[in-house]
A protein has these predicted regions:
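NAD(P)-dependent Rossmann-like dehydrogenase/reductase catalytic/cofactor-binding core
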Residues: 193, 197-255
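NAD(P)+-binding Rossmann beta1-loop-alpha1 motif at the extreme N-terminus of oxidoreductases
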Residues: 1-51, 55-59, 178-181
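Internal alpha-helical scaffold of NAD(P)-dependent oxidoreductase catalytic cores
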Residues: 98-107, 122-206, 247-255
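Short, hydrophobic beta-strand segments that form beta-sheet elements in well-ordered domains
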Residues: 28-32, 65, 87-90, 124-128
Length: 255
């Protein structure tokens, strides 16, 4: 797949690097914006640089928009698009209808991801669903999830927030392992990362089971696991997580 990039921001750069590491790399045509990033990306195979935004659009029907929301109006004024163009927009918080009006008559798909997109095996989220786009990113080794409504898509961005929240907990747990066992911090982090990977495998391979059911299946009565689950539940360990998630979801609905 040949994909033009209008504005090589941090997330667009991460996506390009990740895809180019995969077994199914794309061909990319970059706008010259963000000269330092573009120069570094040119060292990768399959990367070319066009003279300007319009030159990118002239060469590619599929275009990745990687600029900040406040830069979209300026970008839209710099290119003439056709109904054959398909824009994939990474700009957060901008509704599909607004994007469609700004980039008419092109087709528009919203996309979000975390910085982990620099590595195949991470996920990208789409709205609305697009079969061709999903197939291309799946072939490149990414998990792809699409949503029925724009609110659900906006909420998917909070899963990226949860990643950061979890990483803070990993730090605290890893430091405890270091203090109590003499384990080196990288070893402790790797141990906890593998545990999280195993949890993800269980959730993916056994979708018929709830997370709580899986936890209790592992934590049979009398085990350390069960003691930990009971302690965390008694102290409502999930409460601050649920509170902030509810607060952010409420703000999303208002916006």
């Amino acid at each position: 797949m040949r994909l033009g990039v209008l504005g090589v921001g941090a997330l667009a750069e991460a996506l390009i690097r990740g895809v180019q590491q995969s077994d199914c790399p794309f061909e990319w045509c970059l706008s010259p914006r963000s000269a330092e990033r573009v120069a570094q990306l040119q060292a990768l195979p399959g990367i070319s640089v066009a003279a300007d935004n319009q030159a990118v659009a002239d060469q590619c029907d599929m275009l990745l928009v990687g600029v900040r929301p406040q830069q979209l109006e300026q970008l839209a004024a710099s290119v003439q698009l056709t109904p054959e163009h398909h824009l994939i927009c990474l700009s957060a918080g901008v509704e599909l209808q607004t994007l469609q009006q700004a980039f008419h008559p092109a087709r528009v798909t919203r996309m979000t991801a975390s910085i982990a997109v620099a590595y195949p095996g991470s996920s990208v989220f789409l709205y609305p669903a697009d079969t061709e786009l999903s197939a291309k990113f799946t072939a490149a080794g990414y998990g792809v999830q699409s949503f029925a409504t724009e609110l659900q898509f906006e909420a998917s961005m909070l899963s990226v927030c949860v990643n950061a929240w979890w990483l803070e907990q990993v730090q605290a747990l890893a430091e405890t392992l270091v203090e109590q066992t003499g384990m080196r911090l990288p070893e402790a982090v790797a141990l906890l990362a593998r545990a999280q990977q195993e949890s993800a495998v269980l959730l993916q391979q056994r979708p018929e089971s709830t997370p709580t059911a899986l936890a209790r299946e592992i934590g049979t009565p009398g085990t350390f696991t069960a003691r930990g689950l009971d302690h965390l539940k008694a102290n409502q360990a999930e409460r601050p997580w649920v509170e902030i998630l509810n607060q952010l979801l409420t703000e999303l609905k208002r916006s």
